């Protein structure tokens, strides 16, 4: 199966999961990215079961609204039973690298409110040690150079994310992203705390302190479920 076929397979499995596990009238938490987009498409078939959805990005909001979902502000919501999102890397403990799509801060906020984080990914995302995928760090623009020096001191090679058109990439929050290569992430919880304490960092794309509760992994043998 191709990677796109695996993503579609696991997105449908996640839709089946929330249909069974999320009570009618509840609010659904929805992530960002190519796999999350396929999940939105799949879960739209029974969108009327939900009171609405909380989205982690403007892009996901647009896709949800195109399907007729009511998109709610997180400040209006008391509880999110399940948050569904993809990952750029995930290890055996359920810790993840996220932020390839640029929505890491809002993803982390919505995930922090959810009772369960369901990660959906194809088999290539499951790794023994994270770090091959450059680690995204969202940064206040004025602190870009100072934060880059701190990340270099940690052994990383930060690079400012650019758009396809050659401009500086800006997040939905108006910040910039440093993508940090060269890090061997053998202590994801510790590294998440260390980078988040650097002045000017909004958040790092490490989801270890609040990792996945469930992994739905698309493989050539079907969808494998892991509970953490």
Swiss-Prot record:
Active site residues of this protein: 107 (proton acceptor)
Gene assigned in the entry: rpiA
Summary of subunit composition and partner proteins: Homodimer.
Protein name: Ribose-5-phosphate isomerase A
Catalyzed reactions per annotation: aldehydo-D-ribose 5-phosphate = D-ribulose 5-phosphate
Residues that coordinate or bind substrate: 32-35, 85-88, 98-101, 125
Pfam families from the UniProt entry: Rib_5-P_isom_A
Protein's job: Catalyzes the reversible conversion of ribose-5-phosphate to ribulose 5-phosphate.
Cross-referenced PANTHER family: RIBOSE-5-PHOSPHATE ISOMERASE
Gene Ontology CC: cytosol
Enzyme class (EC, first level): isomerase
